[in-house]
UniProtKB/Swiss-Prot annotation:
Pfam families per record: eIF-3c_N, PCI
Gene3D superfamilies, A to Z: Winged helix-like DNA-binding domain superfamily/Winged helix DNA-binding domain (1.10.10.10)
Any GO molecular function: translation initiation factor binding
Oligomeric and partner information: Component of the eukaryotic translation initiation factor 3 (eIF-3) complex.
Protein name: Eukaryotic translation initiation factor 3 subunit C
Top-rank lineage group of the source organism: Eukaryota
Length: 853
C-alpha cells in the first residue's frame, strides 16, 4: 500500500512515516549515484530501480510479516547491482503469478520488461547472462509449449486480449530464445547443477537472511557434513542431507505435492532416487519404489504424448526391483485394500508370522507399463529402426507380466488378504493379449526368455513352466482360466483372442465352431469399442484362414461385412479413413487415434482386399453367366463392391496392363468370363502380395484349381443353350481336369438345379434338356415387363406423395361435407356466391396444384 493511502488517521503517524520513506529514498539514491558513476547511460534504469526498490517492500511473502519490525531496525544498504537483481526477481514473480491465472497480456508486458533489464545486468556481470534470467525464459518457453499443446487437444476459448497476448508471447519467445539456446539447453539438462553458484558455496554469507518457515521439499539443513545419509550441496552453500529417519516425511511431502501445478516432477524423481539409496530396510524401499514408479508415470501427464524410452526403462527396472523385494519379503504385501501407515516419525511394527499391508497395486503398474509401451509404438514411425528397437522392449514387459502374475497368485492363495479375482484376471488377460496374434515360434522364444528371469523357486499355477514350450496349450490354458473365472468383457475378449489364435494357425473349423457357439455376433454391439475392434480382427482372420484352406464361399462370407464397407482401416483400428461428407470432432479424432493398434499388430489390408476380390470373382463370374438364362437370379448380388468395380472396368474404352491388385483381379475376371481360364490364372498368380503368405506356392496351386473349376461352370452356364449333348472328355481336355472331376462338378450343378441336363454315365456325356431355358426373345419380353411394372409402381408412389393430405380438399365450413355436399363450385345454397369474400376455385387447393403440376 502506498504511503498516501495509510490507514491511520493520526497526522503524527503520517508525518513520521513520510520522514522514514524520505530517509530511505535519499540513502538509496546516494548509494545508487556512487555505484553508477561510470554508467551514465543507465540513469533511467537506476531511477526505475529505486522505484522498484520501494515497491519491493510490499512484495514480500506473507510469512515475513512477523519479522518486519526486526528488519526495519536492521536496514541494509544495497548496491545498484543488487537492486537490479531485485527488480529482475520481482518481474519474474509477476510473470509466474500471471501464469497461474493465465493472463497472457500481463506476461507479454513483463516479458518485454525482463528483456530490457537483462542487458544492464549482463554489463555489471562481466558479460555473463544471469542464470536467473535463463531459468525464467526457459520455464516460460515450456509453459508456452504446454499451453499450445493443450489448445490443440482440448481447445478452450480465450478472450481476445488473452489470445493476442498469448500469440505475441509465443512469437517473442520463439525469436528471442534463439540467442540463449545454448544456455537454455544446459539449464534443461541439469537444472540444479546449472543454478548452483560455486562462488556462493565457497564464500561465507555476507548478510544475515531470514529463515523461511516453510521447509523445502525432502531436504534437511545441517551445519556440517556427516557420514550418515546422503548429503548434497544446494544453492547458497547449504548442505542437504537425506537420512533413513526422514524418509517417510519426505515421501509424505512428495505425495502431497503430486498433481499440483508447477511442481517439479524431475526434482521429485531425483529426491526419491536418493531416498532409495539411503533406505535401510525393505519397508522403506517398498514405499520409496511405489512412489518413485508413480512419479515417473506422472511425467506423461503434461505435453508429452507418450513416455520417453529412457524413463520407461527406468520404471521397468524399478518395478523389477519392487517385485524382487516382495518375492523375498513374505511378511510385507502390496495390496489395494490396505490402510496407509500415518505415523511418519517411526516405522510400523512388523512381527514375524504376521503380514503387514502396504497400499498399492502391482497390477496397475504393469498395466501402465503396457499402456505406455503401446502409446509409444503408436507415435513412432513403423518404417524406422527406432520402432524395431522400441519393439524389443516388449520382451522386458512380458517378463514383468509373468512375474506379476506369479506374485498376484501368491496373494490370492492367502484367503485373509481378500484379493479380488478381478486383479488376477486382469494380469492373465494382459498376458493373453501379448501372445494371441503372434506365431508359435515367436511366443516360444518369449516364454523361454521370460522364465529365465524368474527365480527357479517360483512357478505359476495358472501357466506352469512345463507348458511354456507349447504355445497352443498356453493360449488354451489362459483362455480357459478366463472362461471359468470371469464374465462380461474379459470373458468375451478371451474367447476372441483364442479364435484369432486358432485361425492364425490354420485351425479353421475349431475357430468357426467357437465363433458360432459364442453367439458374440448377436451381442457384440453391446460391448465397448475396443472389444468390437477385436471381434472384427478375429472375423477377418477366420476369413483368411478359410481362404488358405480353399473354402472360397466361407472366406467371402466372413470378409463381406468388413471389406464390403470401404472402412477397413477404421473397423480394424489401423488408421483413420476420412469419408467425403463425414464430420468428426477433434475429440472424436483424438479418441480414434488412441484406439489405433501398433503397426506390428496390423493385418495387411492389401492382402485382405486381394483375398476378398479373388473370392468374389470366383463366386460372381459363374453367377453372372447364369443370369442370362435365369431371370429369377437377377436380383441376387454376392458382392456389391466387386460388381461396382467390374462395371467401372467394363466401361473403360482402353485397358492397359494391370498395375495394382484390383487391376489384376478385374482383368482375370474378364478373362474368366470369356472362358480363358489359363489367362485368368496367370493374372491372379502374378499378384505380388501372395509372396507375403506362408506357403505361397500352395496358395497359387489352390487358386489355379479353383479357377479351372469355376471356368468350367461359367462355360456350361454360357453355352448350355447351344448344345444337345457334350462329351465329358471334351470338357476335361478343354479345362485340363480329370473326367472324374468334370463329372463331379456337373453332377453337383444338376443336383442344385443350376443346369437343366442329365449325365449319361454309360457314354460319359452330358445331355441337355430343351425348352427349359428361355430364348432370347422371351428374356427380352420378361425384361420389358419388369421395367414396365417398375415404372407403374414409381408413378403410383409419386402421385400418392403429391396428393397426400388432400382428403379434405372439398370440405367447406357449413357445407354437407364430402364431395357432394354443395351445389356447384361455390358450394352452399346461395348459388355461386362465394363465402367469406374468398373465391376459392377447384384449382386453388392442394389437389389443384397437383393437377397443374
Amino acid at each position: 500500500m502506498s504511503r498516501f493511502f495509510a490507514a491511520s488517521d493520526s497526522s503524527s503517524e503520517e508525518s513520521s512515516e513520510e520522514e522514514l520513506y524520505s530517509d530511505n529514498e535519499a540513502s538509496a539514491q546516494e548509494d545508487s549515484d556512487k555505484d553508477s558513476d561510470d554508467d551514465d547511460s543507465d540513469d533511467d534504469d537506476s531511477s526505475s530501480g529505486s522505484e522498484a526498490g520501494g515497491a519491493n517492500r510490499f512484495l514480500k511473502d506473507a510469512d515475513s510479516d512477523s519479522e518486519s519490525e526486526d528488519e526495519d531496525q536492521n536496514k541494509v544498504l544495497k548496491s545498484a547491482k543488487d537492486k537490479r537483481f531485485d527488480e529482475l526477481e520481482a518481474t519474474i514473480r509477476l510473470i509466474e503469478n500471471a501464469q497461474r491465472i493465465n493472463d497472457w497480456a500481463v506476461i507479454s508486458d513483463q516479458f518485454d520488461k525482463l528483456n530490457r533489464q537483462a542487458p544492464t545486468l549482463m554489463k555489471q556481470n562481466d558479460g555473463k547472462v544471469p542464470k536467473l534470467y535463463i531459468q525464467a525464459i526457459a520455464d516460460l518457453e515450456t509453459v508456452v509449449l504446454e499451453t499450445h499443446e493443450k489448445q490443440k487437444v482440448t481447445p478452450k476459448k480465450m478472450n481476445a486480449v488473452n489470445t493476442r497476448g498469448f500469440n505475441a508471447v509465443r512469437q517473442k519467445v520463439k525469436k528471442h530464445n534463439r540467442e540463449f539456446q545454448k544456455d537454455i539447453d544446459l539449464y534443461r539438462e541439469n537444472k540444479d547443477e546449472f543454478m548452483r553458484e560455486t562462488e556462493e558455496v565457497e564464500a561465507a554469507p555476507k548478510e544475515k537472511k531470514k529463515k523461511s518457515k516453510i521447509p523445502q521439499l525432502g531436504t534437511e539443513i545441517v551445519d556440517e557434513a556427516t557420514d550418515d545419509g546422503f548429503i548434497t550441496v544446494g544453492a547458497g552453500g547449504k548442505a542437504v542431507q537425506y537420512t533413513p529417519e526422514g524418509i517417510l516425511k519426505h515421501l509424505r511431502a512428495i505425495v502431497e505435492q503430486r498433481g499440483r501445478k508447477n511442481s517439479d516432477k524431475l526434482e521429485h524423481i531425483r529426491t526419491l532416487e536418493k531416498l532409495f539409496d539411503v533406505s535401510v530396510n525393505d519397508y522403506q524401499r517398498i514405499r520409496v519404489l511405489l512412489t518413485l514408479i508413480s512419479t515417473r508415470f506422472d511425467l506423461t501427464s503434461g505435453t508429452a504424448s507418450h513416455m520417453h524410452q529412457d524413463q520407461w526403462k527406468l520404471a521397468d527396472q524399478e518395478f523389477g526391483k519392487l517385485l524382487e523385494i516382495l518375492e523375498n519379503t513374505k511378511e510385507i504385501v502390496v495390496i489395494e485394500n490396505a490402510e496407509e501407515w500415518e505415523d511418519d516419525d517411526k516405522l510400523p511394527p512388523i512381527e514375524e508370522g504376521q503380514i503387514f499391508r502396504i497400499p498399492g497395486s502391482v497390477v496397475s503398474f504393469v498395466e501402465r507399463l503396457d499402456d505406455e509401451l503401446t502409446r509409444s509404438l503408436q507415435h513412432i514411425d513403423p518404417h524406422t529402426a527406432e520402432y524395431v528397437e522400441r519393439l524389443t522392449d516388449e520382451a522386458l514387459l512380458y517378463a514383468q507380466l509373468v512375474r506379476a502374475l506369479i506374485y498376484v497368485e501368491s496373494l490370492k492363495k492367502n484367503a485373509s488378504l481378500e484379493l479380488p479375482q478381478e486383479s488376477l484376471n486382469r494380469v492373465v488377460m494382459r498376458r493373453l493379449e501379448h501372445v494371441y496374434f503372434k506365431p508359435s515360434q515367436v511366443v516360444t522364444i518369449m516364454e523361454a526368455n521370460s522364465w529365465k528371469a524368474v527365480p527357479e523357486t517360483l512357478d505359476s499355477e495358472v501357466t506352469p513352466r512345463a507348458i511354456s514350450n507349447d504355445t497352443t496349450s498356453l493360449v488354451q490354458t489362459l483362455s480357459t482360466y478366463l472362461f471359468q473365472n470371469s464374465e462380461g468383457i474379459i470373458r468375451a475378449r478371451a474367447m476372441l483372442c483364442q479364435i484369432y489364435f486358432l485361425a492364425l494357425h490354420d485351425q479353421y473349423y475349431k475357430a468357426r465352431d467357437m465363433m458360432l457357439m459364442s453367439h458374440l455376433q448377436e451381442t457384440i454391439s453391446n460391448f465397448d469399442v475396443n472389444t468390437q475392434i477385436l471381434f472384427n480382427r478375429a472375423l477377418v482372420q477366420v476369413g483368411l484362414c478359410a481362404f488358405r484352406a480353399g473354402l472360397v464361399y466361407e472366406s467371402q462370407n466372413s470378409l463381406q461385412e468388413i471389406c464390403g464397407s470401404n472402412r477397413q482401416k477404421e473397423l480394424l483400428a489401423q488408421g483413420l479413413q476420412m469419408q467425403r461428407y463425414s464430420q468428426i470432432s477433434p475429440e472424436q479424432e483424438r479418441l480414434e487415434r488412441q484406439r489405433q493398434l501398433p503397426f506390428h499388430m496390423h493385418i495387411n489390408l492389401e492382402l485382405l482386399e486381394c483375398v476378398y476380390l479373388t473370392c468374389s470373382m470366383l463366386l460372381e463370374i459363374p453367377l453372372l453367366a447364369q443370369l442370362g438364362s435365369s431371370p429369377d437370379l437377377r436380383k441376387r448380388v454376392i458382392s456389391k463392391t466387386y460388381r461396382r468395380l467390374l462395371e467401372y472396368h467394363e466401361r473403360q474404352i482402353f485397358t492397359g496392363p494391370p498395375e495394382n491388385t484390383r487391376d489384376h483381379v478385374m482383368q482375370a475376371s474378364k478373362a474368366l468370363s470369356a472362358g480363358e481360364w489359363k489367362k485368368a490364372a496367370e493374372f491372379i498368380n502374378s499378384i505380388k502380395i501372395w509372396e507375403l503368405v506362408a506357403d505361397s506356392e500352395k496358395i497359387k496351386e489352390m487358386l489355379s484349381a479353383q479357377i479351372q473349376e469355376e471356368g468350367l461352370r461359367t462355360y456350361l452356364f454360357t453355352y448350355a443353350p447351344y448344345y444337345d449333348t457334350l462329351a465329358v472328355s471334351t470338357l476335361a481336355s478343354m479345362f485340363e481336369l480329370s473326367e472324374r472331376k468334370v463329372s463331379a462338378v456337373v453332377s453337383k450343378m444338376i443336383s442344385h438345379e443350376e443346369l437343366a441336363a442329365a449325365l449319361d454315365q454309360v457314354n460319359s456325356a452330358i445331355i441337355f434338356r430343351k425348352g427349359v431355358e428361355l430364348s432370347r426373345l422371351q428374356t427380352l419380353a420378361l425384361s420389358l415387363s419388369d421395367k414396365a411394372s417398375g415404372l407403374i409402381e414409381s408413378n403410383e408412389k409419386t402421385l400418392e406423395q403429391r396428393t397426400q393430405g388432400t382428403a379434405n380438399a372439398f370440405e367447406r365450413q357449413g357445407g354437407r361435407g364430402g364431395r357432394g355436399g354443395g351445389r356447384g363450385r361455390g358450394g352452399g345454397r346461395g348459388g355461386g356466391v362465394p363465402r367469406g369474400g374468398r373465391n376459392q376455385q377447384f384449382t386453388g387447393g392442394a389437389l389443384g396444384r397437383a393437377i397443374q403440376a
